[in-house]
């Protein structure tokens, strides 16, 4: 129940507590309460009844928490995230972030949807209901992301219609197909008219095309990277979500927009398990905002009240009738958490047992050296850049893998329908001197992607990923390190600390093989995404993203 008006008897009890005629279930006493509307801090009690805030003032409760010298703020809300990118399940993710003050997320589960479709989204909703995390969901709008790759499922108009009936589902997730919106593609428009809220995805879109995109219903954007671009989007009525993650960091460029009530701070799912454990989640984003000179209350608004108002979530403010999601801080500027309450209760966490069907998603045929042979001569080469998800294209004369020139072999193995398809290409930028790294995290279709020096290591790494039913594997003739990811082939069923330990082992082994990329796993995961320029590799072959077509390995 997200509104106190949903049940008459509960509403009666809440009103009685608010009047002072009935003891509250729980009271936070003598807190320094942050008023996000008047932008001030005042002292008072917070009375909770039936999971909602009943009143602010002087109250007594059946249970009380003394909060003298503590600052009370609403639980933080991540307005745009992809939990699967952390490689953690929802329950394990919740165990990490809720104690740090993040009590709500609005997730776009398009990663699992590309593997398991509607059933995968429903599984995440089911798991989330077993956690204290307020898990709101936007229906993935572009699954698959492109016809130039093979995904495990499709989310069409009918699936969107069915998912929108779920209580936690708020609207349509980032509409990446902005060309389809602007050109009034019928299927795209059919998806839009079903949804109340439509999140946008419009990098660099300006002028009349931006007008058309917004006129169609896209009401937010998290891809803004410049102040002028953000200012135009705000002027035209859009809400701007400012990313501050592990890789994509736009806060510095966009901090001039942060005083606006139509701006939010988000992670976009771009917080690695290492960074969550060592630095934090939205609490870290808040601290980054403070480091950039943003006022504490303005920063809080962008992480609480603003996303709540945009999505119509009954939270984000310490005020009567709001969900009693309260964070008590020892220090506001440092966001030093003393206590967290969700619905007026301290959160409890438990494990979730995933069904076997969610653990058997890798249906690929094992590869052999014969199946991954590459042409030589004058060829196209994918160029990767450290810390970037865009790639370049080079034309080189090659006679095969050339370690001295850092020209390696890349393969993408289809893993959803057992077609046996293998996309093959040359890639430069990984720096491997020997061995290979393979993984079943490959945005967005999550086929198996691998980069390596020799065929033996490539086959060893890819085939071990298949045996694990998903994961990340480093091989040098034989397996050197591995991280099993059995849930849809993209998430671990282990504790976050163990995931970090295994991931650290993988990165150490990759470094030993010569790679100097800051995040080799992330870089590898994006060379298969055929909607981000320039040259990508899918199971169907080399993709020229700007031309939106498969191209031949050999250059004309």
Swiss-Prot record:
Cofactor(s) needed: Mn(2+)
Q: Does the keyword Hydrolase apply?
A: yes
Pfam families referenced in this protein's UniProt entry, alphabetically? Adenine_deam_C, Amidohydro_1
Enzyme Commission identifier(s): 3.5.4.2
What is the uppermost EC class here?
hydrolase
Q: Report which reactions are catalysed by this protein.
A: adenine + H2O + H(+) = hypoxanthine + NH4(+)
Q: Name one GO molecular function term.
A: adenine deaminase activity
* InterPro entries according to UniProt: Adenine_deam (IPR006679), Adenine_deam_C (IPR026912), Amidohydro-rel (IPR006680), Metal-dep_hydrolase_composite (IPR011059), Metal_Hydrolase (IPR032466)
For the biological process aspect of GO, one term held by this record is:
adenine catabolic process
Print the keywords alphabetically: Hydrolase, Manganese
Superkingdom of source? Archaea
**Which NCBIfam families does the record cross-reference, listed alphabetically?**
ade
Q: Which family does it belong to?
A: Belongs to the metallo-dependent hydrolases superfamily. Adenine deaminase family.
- Listed name of the protein: Adenine deaminase
Give the species this sequence originates from: Archaeoglobus fulgidus (strain ATCC 49558 / DSM 4304 / JCM 9628 / NBRC 100126 / VC-16)
């Amino acid at each position: 129940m997200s509104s106190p008006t949903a049940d008459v008897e509960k509403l009666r009890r809440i009103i009685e507590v608010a009047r002072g005629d009935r003891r509250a279930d729980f009271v936070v006493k003598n807190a320094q309460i942050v008023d996000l509307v008047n932008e001030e801090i005042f002292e008072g009690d917070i009375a909770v009844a039936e999971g909602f805030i009943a009143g602010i003032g002087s109250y007594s409760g059946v249970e009380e928490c003394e909060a003298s010298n503590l600052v009370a703020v609403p639980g933080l809300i991540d307005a745009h995230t992809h939990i699967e990118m952390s490689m953690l399940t929802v329950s394990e993710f919740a165990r990490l972030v809720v104690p740090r003050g993040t009590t709500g997320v609005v997730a776009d589960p398009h990663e699992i949807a590309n593997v398991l479709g509607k059933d995968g989204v429903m599984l995440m909703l089911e798991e989330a209901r077993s956690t204290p995390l307020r898990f709101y969901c936007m229906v993935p709008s572009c699954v698959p992301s492109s016809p130039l790759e093979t995904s495990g499922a499709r989310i069409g108009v009918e699936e969107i219609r069915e998912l929108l009936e779920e209580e936690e589902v708020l609207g349509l997730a980032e509409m990446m197909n902005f060309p389809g919106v602007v050109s009034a593609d019928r299927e795209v428009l059919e998806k839009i008219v079903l949804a109340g809220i439509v999140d946008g995805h419009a990098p660099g879109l300006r002028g009349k095309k931006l007008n058309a995109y917004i006129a169609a219903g896209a009401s937010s954007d998290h891809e803004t990277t410049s102040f002028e671009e953000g200012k135009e989007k705000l002027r035209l009525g859009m809400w701007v979500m400012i990313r501050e993650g592990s890789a994509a960091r736009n806060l510095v460029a966009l901090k001039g927009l942060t005083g606006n009530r139509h701006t939010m701070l988000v992670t976009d799912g771009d917080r690695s398990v290492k960074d969550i454990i060592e630095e934090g989640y939205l609490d870290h984003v808040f601290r980054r905002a403070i480091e950039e000179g943003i006022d504490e209350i303005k920063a809080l608004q962008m992480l609480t009240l603003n996303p709540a108002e945009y999505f119509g979530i009954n939270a984000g403010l310490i005020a009567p009738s709001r969900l009693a999601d309260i964070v008590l801080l020892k220090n506001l500027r440092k966001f030093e958490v003393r206590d967290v309450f969700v619905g007026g209760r301290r959160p409890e966490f438990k494990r979730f047992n995933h069904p076997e069907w969610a653990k058997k998603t890798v249906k690929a045929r094992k590869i052999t050296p014969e199946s991954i042979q590459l042409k030589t001569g004058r060829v196209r080469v994918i160029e990767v850049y450290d810390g970037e998800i865009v790639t370049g294209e080079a034309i080189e004369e090659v006679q095969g893998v050339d370690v001295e020139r850092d020209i390696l072999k890349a393969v993408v193995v289809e893993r959803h329908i057992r077609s046996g398809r293998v996309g093959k290409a040359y890639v430069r930028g990984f720096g491997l001197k020997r061995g290979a790294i393979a993984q079943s995290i490959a945005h967005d279709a999550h086929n198996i992607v691998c980069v390596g020096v020799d065929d033996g290591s490539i086959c060893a790494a890819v085939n071990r990923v298949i045996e694990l039913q998903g994961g990340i594997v480093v091989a040098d003739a034989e397996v050197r390190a591995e991280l099993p990811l059995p849930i849809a082939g993209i998430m671990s069923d282990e504790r976050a600390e163990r995931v970090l330990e295994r991931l650290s082992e993988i990165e150490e082994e990759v470094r030993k093989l010569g790679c100097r990329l800051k995040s080799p796993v992330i870089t590898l995961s994006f060379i298969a995404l055929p909607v981000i320029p320039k040259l990508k590799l899918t199971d169907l072959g080399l993709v020229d993203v700007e031309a939106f077509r498969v191209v031949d390995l050999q250059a004309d």
